Amino acid sequence: THVLEQYMTYPNGAILQDRFSESVLQTIIDVAPKVLKDPTDYNAASNFMWSCTMALNGLIQKGVPTDWAVHAMGHELTALFGIDHARTLAIVAPSHYKFNFETKKEKLAQYGERVWNITEGSTDDKAHAAIEKTVAFFHDLGIDTKLSDYTQNYEGTAEEIAQRFTDRGWLGLGEHQTLSPDKVEKIVKMSY
């Protein structure tokens, strides 16, 4: 999701930046299952690691809006439950996209078309299908996407994270800086 946080906002005319992100995502979709099947597959592993480098070296975020709210929520799940970073992002991201659907649907549909080859349906249909394809991909990799898959002690987690954000003064996350702690609470609850 490190790529998605620098991509999944709204269309802003940064064609090359979008294509960089989309190519990284397509490469990960192609090679991640191969790496899991055979970690000694040097070609797959090297392409996977190069994709990881591109996800975090700062290139794909240049000149585009970013949304690191999924990261902020995911880090809290790691702190509270010891769930590894990638898994917490897979827990939060689908709920984040569903909660913020109206502001993200254009980019979600673009992602669906360009990364997942979803060509049928309306913008809304493509956007919803893209979220579902992403969840299915996580599952194919053996990554669960609900907090309840990792712990039975999840009740109250959303409220605790919202309070932590309030205490830190994190009152407006996301690309529009409108994701308040009460909205974070709703997203985390959707992730149960």
Role assignments for model-derived ranges:
Residues 6-133:
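Active-site segments that bind and position negatively charged phosphate/pyrophosphate groups
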Residues 1:
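Conserved anion/nucleotide-ligand pocket segment
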Residues 119-192:
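C-terminal charged capping/lid subdomain of soluble metabolic enzymes
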